[in-house]
Amino acid sequence: MTTNMLDLFIEEASEHLQALNDNLLQLEKDPTNGQLVSEIFRSAHTFKGMSATMGFQQVADLTHAMENVLDEVRNNRLAVTEHLVDIIFTCTSHLETMVSDIQHGGQGAADISKTVADLEALLHPEQETDLTVEKTYRIAIQIEEAAILKAVRAVMCLERLAEMGIISETTPDREAIELEEFEQSFEVVLESAQTKDEIKAVILDISEIEKVTVTEEVEEVQVIEPIKKAAKQTTKRLENKTIRVQLEKIEKLMNVFEESVIERARIDEIAEKTNNKELMEHLGRFSSISKEIQNGLLNMRMVPVDSVFNRFPKMVRTLAKELGKKIDLVIEGADTEVDKIVIDEIGDPLVHLIRNSVDHGAETVEVRRKNGKNETATINLKAFHSGNNVVIEIADDGAGINKRKVLEKAIAKNVVTRAESTKMTDAEIFDLLFDSGFSTADQVSDLSGRGVGLDVVRNTILKIGGKISVESSENAGSTFRIEIPLTLSIIQSMLVATSERRYAVPLANVAEAITINPADIQHVHGKDLINYRETIIEVLDLGECFHETPLNDTDELLLLVVKNAKRTFGLIIKDIIGQREIVLKTLGGFFSESQIAFSGATILGDGRVVLILNLETF
């Protein structure tokens, strides 16, 4: 087994698992939808063939048992019930675990005996010993030359054949047939338990069909089916002028490009020092080309948020059943694209927030009825672009956040005083939820309520340069809003100097730079404040924030006015070096205690390492 074959198997398996979960969720709401049943059967059947070909026998055994049950449903001998759907969902959970094991070098081993027994229990005894064997047929259909609506006759044939089995291939493809882009004949590959004569009779029963030839395919076709499908998909991708590239290759290319940005910065420094105008002119043109390359690379790394969102419908269903609640998850904007690196970071925070909405937000059926609500709660998961950011909102129509309860807990924990609590805004009250160990849950549940969720969520979001806020109304629901950057690799920044160091400030956070008189700074309740454009803002000495020597100019101070999600404030600095396009490098394990104050570091053209401020933490 080659690495490429294994990678292809894992990729295809993941796609079929997602299709199984998505279609099962739809089938639960529409249990008489035969098309959904056929789609689910087709996914299980293909999964079985792939697994058997690759030698993952337990995966093949489980999908075969699923296929037997789904075949009974498909042939109207078994009804779709909540119990049946639950068992199939248990199968998909097993398969997810088994595929993960294969991905990490295992053979997909798992204890599936109980689940297989549950599947077999759904079947009638006589059906267990008298299951029909499906065969693969190649069917050539010729329509009369005088027929006026050939496409209509062809589609009728396809619909009749779909009722007898699974259509795995048509020549030409389905779209071409529907557009009548064929002469008189077309071919269909059908997997069916019917005989050749039965299939032929059904097609000839359609008017204006001149000739039908049904040929049974040899067994070899099924053995190489996964390879055929892979080749077919590859051909389709080539037709669409798209290819799949491993993320590692894109990352390597991005790293090389980032090094070129650093080298360009070094050449910029040389050009400025030598005042070489010709070199500066060429650098300007190179910058334009470099920008195009950068945009192309970043676009290659963009993936839809659906790659994270698609795990949540099944999760919400499972959790709702455990808690005895009825919950609908509505997803919007799943095709919104964001950097793959950002996607990898937001998965766990979103899990925390959605579990929180299920556990604390959505009420039980009885409580919702009592409050005059629909007994089914709704959680909306929405994503959309906003400038250079992506906004993700998790909103529920549940109980909302009890502000009085939040304040009482905060007072009891000495987070705020009772006097301070009377002056707090709603935003300030809700912000208390993100303090470490803070929870308003009366009881600790298996899902949440241990006070270890929301602080972790905020810290993770802050580390990637994002921000999170909450809006809530009692008995109307809550909305958690996350705003994250589209990409974390290359950012526009303002380089500033303090008394001892240089720092990079994201340009998106900078409002303006002004000079102020030190005498204008007022000291109130331990804070330095100044009147800025008819608004009182806090002033911080940036160097002093990191234990540097404070600036003691008596005449005037340089103030960089910046904004974050919560407020506008000023940073006292020594000098502004200028705007730079910088490459963001992660800090790894360095600065562990204060790492949250920095989103990363960069290397300047002169070789200096500069820390990048995360202003959301100020």
Swiss-Prot record:
GO terms for cellular component = cytoplasm
UniProt keyword ATP-binding, yes or no? yes
Annotated source species: Listeria monocytogenes serovar 1/2a (strain ATCC BAA-679 / EGD-e)
Q: What is this protein called?
A: Chemotaxis protein CheA
GO MF terms here are: ATP binding; phosphorelay sensor kinase activity
Sites of the modification Phosphohistidine? Answer: H45
**Keyword Iron-sulfur assigned:** no
Span of the signal peptide:
none
Q: What is the phylogenetic placement of the source species in the record?
A: Bacteria, Bacillati, Bacillota, Bacilli, Bacillales
User: What is a biological process (GO) this protein takes part in?
Assistant: chemotaxis
**UniProt cross-references to PANTHER family, sorted A to Z:** CHEMOTAXIS PROTEIN CHEA (PTHR43395:SF1), SENSOR HISTIDINE KINASE CHEA (PTHR43395)
Q: Which reaction does it catalyse?
A: ATP + protein L-histidine = ADP + protein N-phospho-L-histidine
Q: Where in the cell is it found?
A: Cytoplasm
Keywords, in A-Z order: ATP-binding, Chemotaxis, Cytoplasm, Kinase, Nucleotide-binding, Phosphoprotein, Transferase, Two-component regulatory system
- Gene3D superfamilies from the UniProt entry: Histidine kinase CheA-like, homodimeric domain, Histidine kinase CheA-like, P2 response regulator-binding domain, Histidine kinase-like ATPase, C-terminal domain, HPT domain, SH3 Domains
The UniProt record lists the EC number as 2.7.13.3
